[in-house]
């Protein structure tokens, strides 16, 4: 979806939304007159770990390589990393599909507004996946912000002015200092931002990139730099309202500076914006720490979204406290650190050169979430922003088979010595939920937010009287927001015509379907992303209208912001009338691929494993080497207690990693 809500509402499937109000706990105290220069001090953990950390500083045992790739097609990771989708230019896409002279902006002069005047706005109903209009009155017009209030709501004027002034005088300059500037003057020709206060069905607030384009591009656009807040759930004048202002303004800035940033990174910085404005709370963080097997580097719809907010929030708190130094989050945004996580590893390496990969940085954060002891090693395993320690799970003697998410964490313990621990992790993991339909390879669309992947080739249909395109298709895309298309161009690629297939859809509830599009889950058209898994289906498209011509054929996958699925696979592509057949088995088959990549669907499974050892007088973090078959043997001596930490560490996939742990008396 193209909207960034402020916080999660766990009961909403398929969309980001606000946290249930009862879960929110506003930060104590008013907004400080001077913005804080660092994270607010958060209370020390109140829930003790199952083992007692030591106050004796002890260095961790750190070999030169903590993660060893196992036997699998390692080049797949390199190939995928090099296949970068293009950014989504909504205006250019609309022009390519629909033609016409599409303006970049709605106006070039500032809005002519007056207090008391009313305007009509589009609002998203996240629950029912529709858009509707409301009438709102301008109640405040300042140098930075225009505050509109739904005419059906009774909001005291002094509270409107209070929050408007907090935003203009404190949040606005603070966010711009930390995260950079928003788009000015933008689509509306006005440097002022619009904040619409209304009831929102299914969410508590959002920023939508659709509002930043003209209605010629998206008919639901409000043609303003703006965000929307549920003034019933978060009344103006409240701490939660002001926190939402800080949160959504970061999204607005971020979209302008780096629209392709993945949601986990973008949301993490919006949570950090709340913290750095003195408005943060720990509701989502606690949800994550209760369920730490949550993948940091992705974003899932449904009830689990609260944990994703918490993971992103805690990681950014840790990163900012430990490694920000003289850098600003704006620098991380400009470096596209969300898509290039080695940027974050390099940031950490300035202080600690032993951090080589993002997995090393992630592992230190994961240990800190279990330990939070500043006296162990050099202080890397602690930060003030953690409200309690991560939950652990007990292991019984014998062999336990389990799965863990990529960049999620299983904490196992306490484990009492004497004890032997044998770990055996899977060598490989699937890229998506299926393997190629035939042969060893298929074309994968890649995945990402605000991105466009294309696969294009020339087709000579001049010598035939009819033509048919057939192919095998698998997809898991965010329904009604992210679409795949099959198109033909007969003017060299300037304009493209979408083609109907067996499972394409022509309805367009969100203004994103360019004609005939594939969306949702293949084989389950009425199921939202995250419900059931897709399956391979047979597709057939009539090319007869283009016979007698030399044309270009193009597959597209276009995703908006906030949520994305595993993407699309295509295989066994044929136009039998001209003798064309391609199963992605050899080289590029004459295709021009942007974002798309040939894949076997199998990636090497990498691992992060740590053993936290607690003696009577010291705490140690053991970083074992993993052999080339993903195996480790560890020992806990008599009188020691331990926690075993296991994480998957393979990029690009959201499929879980399988492993076995065997506990026995040595």
Predicted segment positions?
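Juxtacatalytic substrate-recognition/specificity segment
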Residues: 140-269, 277-301
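N-terminal module-boundary/linker segments of secreted carbohydrate-active enzymes
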Residues: 53, 57-180, 184
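Short, conserved beta-strand segments of beta-strand-rich sandwich/propeller modules, principally
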Residues: 468, 550-554, 641-643
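Bacterial signal peptide processing site
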Residues: 28-30
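Acidic/His/Gly-enriched intrinsically disordered linker/tail segments
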Residues: 210, 214-222, 239, 243, ...
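Exoplasmic/lumenal beta-rich domain surfaces
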Residues: 487-550, 598-629
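C-terminal motif of bacterial Sec signal peptides marking the signal peptidase cleavage site
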Residues: 23-26
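Beta/coil-rich, acidic/histidine-enriched accessory regions frequently appended to metallopeptidases
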Residues: 34, 38-52, 56-66, 341-458, ...
